[in-house]
Every structure is written in structure tokens, then in C-alpha cells.
């Protein structure tokens, strides 16, 4: 199985990209969540100039964040800096939109966006709509400014539902999901993609998760494991705290953790400004104060924690399910965590 990393965009991220490339990792991504992280295209431009082999991606952008022409120009510009190494990840903007106090895009809007960006990045004209006006648009500055010759890989984010997976199928794109360790769930996503377009090409499947390799006799739910995986657990709790319907689907212990999180952040599930309280520090290393919210059952469900032997067995099972690349977000000591990932999958 291939291995990659995803990080928050910030100054110095290019140094991590260089180290990831030196370790032989396959991809390096940055998030696109403007209200909590730096700009991903600025970050990847630096990474493109500093690296030579590793694939570089956005994980993921959204039609609610950028117009299709603006997004296509950004990706095609990156492709001019790192020809054939760019991954365009696209989703409904579930988190990026919620940090604005808004809801995510619907699947139909997602598909229109992917289609338009694929067309433009492939050097083809596409339909661009603003209200009732529709125009055919194309790059007028193709050449030195952008690269529409080398292919860009397209990947669609799908969490559990089949709609986004079907978009990936119809657009011949890959799939990416976060914290989805259930082989049956992955099988369902792959089937939804295949059923939507049986004859279309299919891209790779990417699993984004957190990883903690246990030392001998280490507590799998101790402070070190919670610090390494807590950002992923907290992302689920923040989503549930922001979305009462999602919280209702959780078990009693998880709902209690959501209640404590809301109380700790001095907000409620219905407060109009709750997003300003729930998302600061999103997908960063958790604080020691929040370790009690990192429930063992959620750690097990969302992250990979175990001895090297245990983890290799689990990863082999995931690979048999059809996952092509394991992507982790290192938060405690990124260079060391990336080295451990490379050693684990060597």
C-alpha cells in the first residue's frame, strides 16, 4: 500500500514535504479550510518548488469556497510548477463551510464543479453559470501560465453516503474518506462508484486517518496515543456538537463527550455563533485539558493504534478491501511520525 501525509497549511510546510519525499512517501496534501488554516495553494506552491517527485494535493476544496474557473486556474498553475504531480481533491465542504456557519454543498453542485474543473484543467471549454447567465469559458492564457497538458488526478471526498461516490464514478475520479476503517463501508462506496458508471475509469482510493505505533507494554489509550489521534476524534465530536442530528446517532458515552465539549467551549448546539467556539484549533494537536474527551471507542473506530505487527495486519486487510493509499496527519512530531509511517509500510 502507498503512503502519504496531510497537514494544515502554514509557513514551513515545504520542509515537511521535502522530508516526506526523502522518506519515499507517495503524496503530500494540505487542507483547504480557510477560516482555520493557511492558504493551501500558497503552501503547495512552495512545496512544488522544493520537491521533485512526490505528488502534491489539496484535501479537499469545495465549490462553496471557490468558483470553478478560480479553482481550475489554481490547480493548473500548480501543475505548471509540478507537472503531472498534482491531486485535486474535491468535496462538499463539510468542515470548511461549517467554520463559516454555513451548510455544505449538495451532490449536484459538487458534480457540476468537478466537471468544470476537469474540463478547464484538461484544456477544454466548459459551461460557467452565474444566476441565469451561462457562458462557455476556457483558459485564454494557456501555455507558460498554466499546464493543461500533464494530467491532474481528481479525487472526490465521500464519507458514508453513496451520492458523492456516485459523482466520483461518473467523473472517473478516485475516492477519499476520513476515519473510515470499516471494510464493509469501503466496499459500499466502491460499489456506489462502480454502479454509477460501470464503464468509466476508476481512480485510487485514499484513507485518511491517524496513526500511533505502540511501544512495548504501552497503554493503547494513554496520553501519547490520545495526543497522536485526538485531532481526528475531536473533529468528529465538533461535527456532532455542531449537528444535533449527527449527535443523536452516537452512543451514550459519545453523546456525553459532545455535551462536555459544548460546555467546555461555552456554547450550545443551537447557538448561532457556535462555529466560532467549536472550530478553533481544528485538526491541530489537542490540548492536555481535552484528553478526557478522546474516548477509547472513538480512537479504535477512527484511528490506527497498535504494535507494528498488529498494524500491518490491519493495513493488509484494508488493502484487500481496495484502499490504495494510507494518508495520515502527523501532529505531535511530524518528521518522526512520517518516518514511522514509511518504516511501517516499507
State what each model feature region is:
Residues 1-59, 152, 331:
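N-terminal beta1-alpha1-beta2 module of alpha/beta enzyme domains
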Residues 1-11, 61-69, 150-160, 211-214, ...:
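Active-site mouth loops of central-metabolism enzymes
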Residues 3-7, 28-30, 56-59, 86-90, ...:
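Hydrophobic faces of well-ordered beta-strands that scaffold small-molecule active sites
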Residues 9-20, 74, 158-167, 307-317:
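Short, acidic/polar
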Residues 24, 47, 78, 117, ...:
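Conserved, mostly hydrophobic/aromatic
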Residues 37-45, 180-195, 334-339:
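Active-site-adjacent beta->alpha loops and helix N-cap segments on the catalytic face
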Residues 72-203:
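Internal, glycine-rich beta/alpha segment that forms the wall or movable "lid"
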Residues 103, 107-144, 187-317:
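An alpha-helical appendage that flanks or caps ligand/catalytic pockets
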Amino acid at each position: 500500500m502507498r503512503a502519504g501525509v496531510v497537514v494544515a497549511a502554514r509557513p514551513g510546510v515545504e520542509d515537511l514535504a521535502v522530508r516526506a519525499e526523502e522518506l519515499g512517501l507517495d503524496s503530500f496534501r494540505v487542507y483547504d479550510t480557510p477560516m482555520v488554516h493557511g492558504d493551501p495553494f500558497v503552501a503547495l506552491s512552495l512545496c512544488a518548488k522544493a520537491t521533485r517527485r512526490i505528488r502534491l494535493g489539496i484535501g479537499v476544496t469545495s465549490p462553496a469556497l471557490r468558483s470553478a474557473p478560480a479553482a481550475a486556474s489554481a490547480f493548473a498553475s500548480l501543475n505548471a510548477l509540478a507537472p503531472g504531480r498534482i491531486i485535486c481533491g474535491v468535496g462538499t465542504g463539510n468542515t470548511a463551510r461549517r467554520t463559516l456557519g454555513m451548510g455544505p454543498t449538495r451532490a449536484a453542485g459538487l458534480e457540476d464543479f468537478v466537471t468544470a474543473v476537469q474540463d478547464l484543467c484538461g484544456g477544454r471549454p466548459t459551461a460557467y453559470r452565474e444566476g441565469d447567465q451561462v457562458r462557455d469559458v476556457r483558459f485564454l492564457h494557456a501555455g507558460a501560465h498554466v499546464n493543461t497538458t500533464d494530467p491532474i488526478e481528481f479525487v472526490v471526498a465521500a464519507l458514508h453516503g453513496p451520492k458523492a461516490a456516485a459523482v466520483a464514478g461518473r467523473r472517473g475520479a478516485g475516492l477519499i474518506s476520513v476515519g473510515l476503517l470499516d471494510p464493509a463501508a469501503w466496499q459500499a462506496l466502491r460499489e456506489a462508484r462502480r454502479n454509477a458508471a460501470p464503464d468509466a475509469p476508476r481512480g485510487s482510493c485514499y484513507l485518511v486517518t491517524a496513526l500511533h505505533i505502540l511501544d512495548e507494554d504501552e497503554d493503547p489509550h494513554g496520553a501519547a496515543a490520545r495526543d497522536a489521534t485526538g485531532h481526528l476524534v475531536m473533529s468528529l465530536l465538533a461535527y456532532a456538537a455542531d449537528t444535533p442530528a449527527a449527535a443523536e446517532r452516537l452512543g451514550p458515552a459519545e453523546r456525553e463527550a459532545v455535551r462536555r465539549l459544548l460546555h467546555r467551549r461555552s456554547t450550545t448546539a443551537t447557538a448561532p455563533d457556535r462555529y466560532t467556539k467549536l472550530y478553533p484549533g481544528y485538526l491541530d494537536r489537542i490540548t492536555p485539558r481535552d484528553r478526557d474527551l478522546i474516548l477509547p471507542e472513538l480512537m479504535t473506530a477512527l484511528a490506527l493504534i497498535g504494535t507494528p505487527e498488529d498494524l500491518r495486519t490491519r493495513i493488509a486487510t484494508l488493502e484487500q478491501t481496495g484502499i490504495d493509499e494510507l494518508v495520515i496527519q502527523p501532529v505531535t512530531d511530524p518528521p518522526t511520525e512520517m518516518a514511522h509511517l514509511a518504516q511501517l509500510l516499507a
